[in-house]
Amino acid sequence: MECYRCGVSGCHLKITCSAEETFCYKWLNKISNERWLGCAKTCTEIDTWNVYNKCCTTNLCNT
């Protein structure tokens, strides 16, 4: 599986996940508007007043 990942040029770098990493995630700090994207072995979806985290299991779904 591939996911987008944040890098020096923004969050557009595509990476291939390891066999153990079955989730793509998109994590957003709602206060600072910073975001992180990548692969994960486990993932918990969160939507609170200050944090949003989306998990997905298909290629390049964390845009």
From Swiss-Prot:
<keyword id="KW-1015">Disulfide bond</keyword>
<feature type="disulfide bond">
    <location>
        <begin position="6"/>
        <end position="11"/>
    </location>
</feature>
<feature type="disulfide bond">
    <location>
        <begin position="17"/>
        <end position="39"/>
    </location>
</feature>
<dbReference type="InterPro" id="IPR035076">
    <property type="entry name" value="Toxin/TOLIP"/>
</dbReference>
<dbReference type="Pfam" id="PF00087">
    <property type="entry name" value="Toxin_TOLIP"/>
</dbReference>
<dbReference type="InterPro" id="IPR045860">
    <property type="entry name" value="Snake_toxin-like_sf"/>
</dbReference>
<keyword id="KW-0638">Presynaptic neurotoxin</keyword>
<keyword id="KW-0964">Secreted</keyword>
<comment type="function">
    <text>This toxin is described as enhancing presynaptic acetylcholine release, but neither experimental results, nor references to other sources are available.</text>
</comment>
<keyword id="KW-0800">Toxin</keyword>
<comment type="similarity">
    <text>Belongs to the three-finger toxin family. Ancestral subfamily. Orphan group XIX sub-subfamily.</text>
</comment>
<dbReference type="GO" id="GO:0005576">
    <property type="term" value="C:extracellular region"/>
</dbReference>
<protein>
    <recommendedName>
        <fullName>Bucandin</fullName>
    </recommendedName>
</protein>
<feature type="disulfide bond">
    <location>
        <begin position="3"/>
        <end position="24"/>
    </location>
</feature>
<keyword id="KW-0528">Neurotoxin</keyword>
<dbReference type="GO" id="GO:0090729">
    <property type="term" value="F:toxin activity"/>
</dbReference>
<feature type="disulfide bond">
    <location>
        <begin position="43"/>
        <end position="55"/>
    </location>
</feature>
<feature type="disulfide bond">
    <location>
        <begin position="56"/>
        <end position="61"/>
    </location>
</feature>
